[in-house]
Amino acid sequence: MLYQSIKEEQVLVHTGAEEAIFTFMNAVLESNDHIIVHFPCYQSLFEVANAIGCEVTLWETHEENGWELDLDRLRQSIKRNTKAIIINCPHNPTGYLMSKTTQQQIIEIAREHQCIVFSDEVYRGLEQNPDETLPAACDLYEHAVSLGVMSKTFGLPGLRIGWIATHNQHIYASMATFKDYLTICNSA
């Protein structure tokens, strides 16, 4: 089961991850917003926000530290206008897998500062040890958006199917409205 608390009406299907990222950022972010992005990462996770005019802080990780996330750096990066924290786990391109404790701390920091968490989870389910699979962010936090696709975990890239899952009805409705101008029918 992908999600513990998400109902089908809380899942919005897209034509792959790229469309979901583009939709989220255009529907939810504004040009004066600030976002923090786990880096290195899939380029669209920061470049779409740059194109909108957002201020982007790259939350850099380094090989010599085992790609570990620095939570103090995250706290220091938050500004008055920080709207979202963008995370990716299991991580592309490093393979880093944060601990459940680190994931929970990120959620708590986001909650404290009323930030959205956009969690790129396209490699979720491919962990070598299934016991290390993290919960979906959308199951942990009411203002989290989890991104999934068929191409990675399920090995079905030709279908071009992606989705977001969220409890936040405002985010869902904003994305659904914006998506109406992109595609009206995904791969069938």
Where would I find each of the regions flagged by the language model?
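Glycine/Thr-rich phosphate-binding loops of Rossmann-like dinucleotide-binding domains
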Residues: 21, 45, 94-95, 172
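PLP-dependent aminotransferase-like
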Residues: 26-87, 100
